[in-house]
């Protein structure tokens, strides 16, 4: 008579074989065709097919003329990138935001830089139609912003939260809501905390969460901007007027206050819905990675999450391999958390596509 352990061996072998086959079936995600940082990223699941997009950003020189209009699309099924038609405009942009919805990608704002290092926030809303490789213009953003937080609600409304606006010469508290069905804008309840730019966050269910960012130094011009440690949660009404947001201050998240963290929302396997945050730096800086205080910014290795079910912070990793900063988003997929491009240690612009496998612990 066979022992219980012997009976289990075939089943264990089958499980291991299936796991190995699944791993073998998933191709490695190729680096971007060119190194880029501060690029707007999005993921589409139209018709059950995942597609990853990267728009604009800055190249390795980190100068005004290294800002690009380039656009790329990846099929995770092959792990390969395809170059797409460049984003319209006379110049590339930094600090834009992107959201994919159905068969389109909406690209909001950002700023352009001239040869004298002058920066101008743009009001552009460009909508990319991947299957046709074309763009069309949506209704301009009422208050132009860059370095804002963006989130999708009910597969229809896109929230643009805070950010910097050169028209105001400051960060703004506006929460602007774009109706993708009607191509119209609404103004929602402003953020009650310090207006910030370079903050990070997303929407999960009817919950907005954003953290950190930078703001003008109230003590003077040295440094010009300092990091914010504020964390906020906004509740969007399930019924009635979606612009009436109820804001609540959250306790501090794991790790230091940071700037330009990669953030994104979604379920991961059987885990409850979470908003994930990874990388970023505790030194606010301009587009070259050198802090407003004159010190070089370096990426944080901390990855953490907000659990929408418990309403609590979770530490995912205090030592994320090859951490990066200078991000405009993070993509939550069945593979893990995908980070596209960014700046590595030493302010080096990278083409890498990194997959972070989270194992949450409190």
Predicted regions and their residues:
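Bacterial N-terminal signal peptides
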Residues: 10-20
């Amino acid at each position: 008579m066979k022992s219980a352990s012997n009976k289990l061996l075939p089943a264990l072998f089958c499980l291991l074989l299936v796991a190995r086959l699944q791993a073998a079936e998933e191709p490695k995600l190729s680096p971007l065709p060119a190194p880029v940082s501060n690029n707007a990223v999005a993921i589409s699941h139209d018709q059950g097919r995942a597609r990853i997009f990267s728009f604009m950003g800055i190249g390795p020189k980190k100068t005004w003329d290294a800002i690009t209009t380039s656009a790329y699309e990846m099929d995770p099924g092959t792990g390969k990138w395809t170059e797409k038609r460049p984003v319209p405009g006379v110049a590339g942009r930094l600090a834009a935001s992107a959201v994919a919805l159905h068969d389109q990608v909406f690209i909001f704002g950002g700023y352009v830089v001239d040869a004298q290092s002058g920066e101008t926030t743009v009001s552009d809303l460009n909508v990319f139609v991947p299957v046709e490789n074309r763009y069309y213009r949506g209704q301009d953003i009422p208050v132009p912003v860059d370095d804002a937080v963006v989130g999708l609600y009910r597969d229809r409304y896109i929230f643009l939260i805070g950010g910097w606006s050169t028209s105001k010469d400051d960060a703004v508290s506006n929460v602007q809501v774009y109706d993708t069905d009607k191509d119209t804008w609404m103004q929602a309840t402003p953020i009650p905390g310090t207006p910030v730019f370079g903050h990070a966050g997303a929407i999960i269910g009817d919950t907005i969460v954003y953290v950190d960012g930078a703001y003008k130094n109230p003590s003077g011009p040295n440094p010009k901007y300092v990091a914010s440690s504020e964390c906020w949660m906004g509740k969007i009404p399930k019924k009635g007027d979606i612009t009436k947001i109820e804001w609540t201050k959250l306790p501090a998240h794991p790790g230091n206050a940071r700037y330009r963290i990669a953030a994104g929302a979604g379920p991961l396997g059987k885990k409850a819905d979470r908003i994930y945050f990874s990388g970023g730096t505790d030194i606010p800086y301009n587009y070259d990675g050198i802090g407003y205080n004159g010190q070089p910014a370096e990426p944080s290795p901390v990855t953490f999450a907000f659990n929408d079910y418990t309403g609590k912070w979770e530490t995912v990793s205090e030592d994320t391999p090859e951490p990066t900063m200078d991000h405009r988003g993070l993509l939550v997929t069945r593979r893990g958390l995908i980070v596209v491009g960014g700046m590595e240690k030493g302010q080096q612009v990278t083409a890498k596509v990194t997959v972070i496998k989270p194992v949450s612990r409190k």
